[in-house]
Structures are given as structure tokens and as C-alpha cells.
């Protein structure tokens, strides 16, 4: 969901309701934008254009996102938060940590972060601790690796995009996906 409006009739649907062809299992919130469009929320400015102060932006204040996610979490929905930038990933992990602190069996909850693109090493540690499943847009590496490295975020951050090898080494479950037709 972008914003906090609840779609008409959505409150009548329960998690896992449906049939063999269509079942409702989750709700997705959009915490930031795209790295290629320089709208993903970063802690440090983008590298391009040179000298920029652009850091992208969060779509929600942290408390607003928490208050939007909590009712769905409490009803048992699988929650996914779109977070490309490290600032948005921080926000998603902070909210997930707060939500999981209030439940008896946190390991039974299915929480995802979609994209998990520009990362910091400590985010991988917290992701594992919380049991969050990152979903990587693996096309970023093939189609955008060079622009990330040379222009968008620079070498150091580009070397940490979509860190599936690090996640595998640490025993963290993760998924791959595509944003087709937006990108392959």
C-alpha cells in the first residue's frame, strides 16, 4: 500500500483466504523509491550527479509506517515492505523488530523486505536475527551493476547490492524476483 488508505472491501478478506487459483496472503507497503531514479532512501547521498546531496526519500515517517503495518500484522497477514535504500531498510527492520517484540512466537511470522538493494553489513545481521526474508531484484546485478558502480552509488556501495552470497553464507533465507515489465 502506498499511503495509509485501506482499499474498499479489503477488511472483509482474511489472510490465506481464496481458492486453488487465487489466495490472499500478504500486504505490501512501499517505503521508498528506486535506486536508478535516485528516489530510494539512502543514508549517504548518491554519487551522481557529482557533488549531489540527493539521498532519496522515505514515503513514511517510521511511526506512520508502523501504525499502517501493525493492524495487518496483528491479523496474521504476511507483510512485505519495499525498501531499496539502506535508510528504508533501516526503517523496515526497526518496524519489524518492534512488531516482533510484541508476539510470543516471532519465528512463525513471515516478514519480507522487497529489493534490499543498497545495504550495510549490520543490516544482514539484524535480518538474520529477526528472520526477515529479503527478496533481491537479481536483474540489478546484471543490468545495473556497472551504472551502480560507476555512477549511481560508487564502488563501495555497489559491491554490497543484492548481497545473496553473504546471506547464503550466513544461513539467511532469501528470494529472487524480477520487476518485469519495468525491468527484466
Regions flagged by a language model, labelled:
Residues 1-28, 108-121, 147-175:
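Phosphate/diphosphate-binding loops
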Residues 1-78, 124:
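Active-site-adjacent helix-turn-beta-strand microarchitecture at beta-sheet edges
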Residues 35-57, 99-108, 133-155:
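Active-site gating loops and adjacent loop-to-helix segments of metal-dependent hydrolytic enzymes
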Residues 8-13, 89-102:
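Distinct, well-ordered alpha-helical segments
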Residues 89-97, 144-150, 180-184:
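Histidine/acidic-residue-rich catalytic or RNA/ligand-binding cores of hydrolases
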Residues 35, 77-87, 136-138, 167-184:
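Short acidic/histidine-rich active-site segments
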Residues 2-6, 27-30, 82-86, 116-118, ...:
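Active-site beta-loop-alpha junctions enriched in small/polar residues
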Residues 65-72, 86-94, 114, 118, ...:
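Long, K/E/R/D-enriched contiguous segments that form extended
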